[in-house]
Amino acid sequence: MQEEIIMDLKPTIPHLPRLEDKSKIDVRYALISPFAYSHIYWDDKKKEVLYELEEPLLSEREKQILNKIESSMREIINMNVLVEKTIEAMIEYIDKMAELLISELNLTLSGESYKKIFYYLFRNFVGLNEIEPLMSDYFIEDIECNGIDTPVYIIHRIYRNMKTNIVFKDVDKLASFVEKLAQRCGRYISYASPLFDGSLPDGSRVNATYTTDVTTHGPTFTIRKFTKTPWTPPQLIAFRTLSPEMLAYFWILIQYKANILITG
């Protein structure tokens, strides 16, 4: 019997400094505590700010055990039922199934190894695989993958456009992930219908392609995340999205029920 898994999917949102000098950027904060963290820093060699996802490192033996458990879980878990549960219920369910399979497969694991493997089971079954930690990052607005062998890019609220250390290297694996995105959006994608756009349960918008007939580097996807709480006028002013005068003008238009057209 392993000790209880504690996973914080909504860690405290940190205050990030806005630095004019990009070479001074070096911040780290939790995404899925205590397993996944983001490290944003200036790379002197590449002369750019990078977004590095830090996750638990698995030994070769741990990778083999993870693959065995994942293969067995896919045969017995109904994913449609699983994703309808609460986060707490899903964590408990994955935990019980993992312990059952470890026992049936006669595997031995230390407590630390089990925690790391459990994180990847949760990430890959309940979450959105490699990009699940990015979905948990409050500061990320857009996630973009332009095919295999190219880094996933993100748009950050504070540090804007950045390259990540996430790279899909296998066409079939990326195609499978795009299928998963479509399923989570309640849509269908295939060779006959290789384009889709839809919404994830959290409201995030997804656009994706499926085959090399559509895009040269294989399947692609873009996710535009939305905040659960809409921006307030003071926040829009603080972010310099709008000036006080612009908001005052909108206020007058709305108050007198004028017609408004917003593009972009």
Model-derived regions, located:
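Hydrophobic anchor at the beta1->P-loop junction of P-loop NTPases
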Residues: 262-264
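A general structural signal for well-ordered secondary-structure junctions
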Residues: 140, 259-260
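N-terminal accessory targeting/assembly segments
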Residues: 1-189, 201
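P-loop NTP-binding catalytic core
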Residues: 145-259
